Amino acid sequence: MDEPTKRIPEFFGCMVFNEDKMRQRLSADAYEAWQQCMTHGTPLPRSIADQIAAAMKDWATELGATHYTHWFQPMTGVTAEKHDSFITPSGNDSVIMELSGKELSRGEADASSFPSGGLRATFEARGYTAWDPTSYAFVKDKTLYIPTVFCSYSGQTLDKKTPLLRSISRLDQQCLRILRLFGNTEAHHVIPQVGPEQEYFLIDKSMYQRREDLKLCGRTLFGARPPKGQELDDHYYGAIKPRVAIFMQELDEELWKLGVFAKTEHNEVAPAQHELAPVYTDANTATDHNQLTMALLKKVADRHDLVCLLHEKPFAGVNGSGKHDNWSLATDTGENLLKPGKTPSQNAQFLLFLAAFIKGVDEYQDILRCCVSYPGNDLRLGGSEAPPAVISIFLGDELTAVLDSIIQGTAYVDMTKKKLEIGVDTLPEIPQDTTDRNRTSPLAFTGNKFEFRMLGSSQSIASPNTVLNTIMADELGQFADILEQAQDFKSALQTLLHDTFKAHQRIIFNGNGYDDSWAEEARRRGLSNHRDTVDSMPAYIDPKNISLFTRHDVFSEVEMRARYGIHLENYCKITAIEANTLLSMIRRNIFPAVSRYTSDLARAVQRKKALYLDCSAETDLLQQLTNLNNELYTTAQSMAQALENAPASEGGLASARYYRDVVYALEYKASHLVNELEANTSAEYWPYPTYADILFSV
């Protein structure tokens, strides 16, 4: 083992103020108080907060930190921070380095400058950040980062972390009720475990700088299909190029220093596409870590003259990027509640948790679809590269057979675990999993967890996990209400499983989600099919969903309606930015470039005619390009008029529909016209790098 490899355990988490560092630097009383705060939510006395703050500051300054920031996750989907130095005047024009318990525990931010959905007006600017002691502070770029929640002056949530923490707490409470019914008195907490698989593209910075659409929108707004894409399937799991490997190595080291469990990396399907997957951890930490991962992907790429694209669909014609959210439940004693065991038909506890998940997904499929809706994800979902827009659950043959036997009241004989015959004697036998890998399913059971595959690559994982946690808490609470009152627990459990699986079996689909027939089958089953963000957003204000989140105190009705408004406004603004960017590129570069080329073609035709030479090829091309350029000009004019006539982005559903049906429709038409022009215009005239230039630049 070489020296750098030996050092990994030593420097892992070296920039994190974790439990070990607290144990070393805090008094026994302060450490115990922090532990009680972590496990039981006990408030920290001011004196203890002061001691923790002082220890945290001393540790951070030893690492070179000069500032601290309350790091929070507003409704923008990315993190926010305001940096304050540790300096405090001490008289005689001198300073000391200090961080008080008050500064650690609470900060202030201008809430009116972040998306609030009407919860904050410009003249109601005050918002507060409050320390989340369940997330470790860390040092990055000579700044102490303190994870916090963000709320308004009146206490309404303005971030993504607060609802997540609330949902984790509610789920914990309901899981313990179920475990007690099965005689488990050892577990004191149940924590959702999450492992997000992060996909991304890496392109050369010089190519990025020459495309306004990439710089302003994060994706290309046009691009003719390159001669080679992903047809040969040669990029997926292919050898990692040296330049990318060096980037990945540095990224791993940066993440490991911050305590992020970066584990697996490989090439993805599309050219220039890659994936990074971490080891599972609790949902709150996983959410923080994924935000750090996305930030460091961009930062480290920049050091290597690369650009990391996190957009869901940066290039048409090749696979887009998603983020598979692997979700499970674990007790503080180490038991995975979604692990079937060797005989799932007899594992009643597992079946009850499975029933709760199936029931919850069926009843709240609209809000699950809604929580992954985003303009970028609209370009990916429903194509033959990502799950369809219809929510369904894949269980695999064995579990489906178990459910069928419960529904029909027949005995079930467990399948003997088969062996996959490899056919090569030198290889060991590999046990065949009881579930295949159905890549077309939005929610797939993969042995001991559910894989939610609809998330977009740029999306925070906070909202989807908040929804999963709340749905599960609600269903488990209903089950506990029934079983706690049962005279005969075993009989009541059997009836509950039978009734639940029978009532909600429509949500289970083990087939090919890419097949066109699935949409019709889903309609026949009564499943919802919201094709885009605009159609799915009303789920936020559906009385059923408002009732779900308010009865568990995850959101208030006002907070739900605010998020509905924020997402619709965001849709309008993103669509407007893309349309304006494309309009600028067409008017300033594409139309003039094609005009120059056609002018030169026209002169070539005249010269050939003067020499009585055949110029039919040039004439045909000239006519084709002239027609396309004229149509592009007309479409651009219509797009400009549509933008001028557009309603205010704060206009709710009506405004979002206008941007989708009018503005985006014209953008889509213009994009395809540009693609045709690119494919037929001489390379020396074309003003932008092509897909072939960009995708194969690294």
Predicted feature locations:
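Active-site-proximal loop/turn and secondary-structure-junction residues that shape catalytic pockets
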Residues: 48-52, 72-74, 102-103, 150, ...
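Histidine-centered active-site/metal-ligand motif
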Residues: 47, 67-70, 266-268, 324-326
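Histidine/acidic residue-rich metal-binding segments in metalloenzymes
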Residues: 4-7, 11-101, 106-121
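Hydrophobic/aromatic-rich, well-ordered segments within soluble, folded domains that form packed cores
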Residues: 65, 69-73, 289-303, 329, ...
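C-terminal amphipathic alpha-helical interaction region
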Residues: 497-698
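Glycine-rich, acidic/polar active-site loops that bind/position phosphate-bearing ligands
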Residues: 124-310, 319-322, 329-565
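Flexible inter-domain linker/hinge segments
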Residues: 1, 6-20, 169, 173, ...
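Short linear, low-complexity motifs centered on an aromatic residue
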Residues: 77-93, 112, 211, 218-220, ...
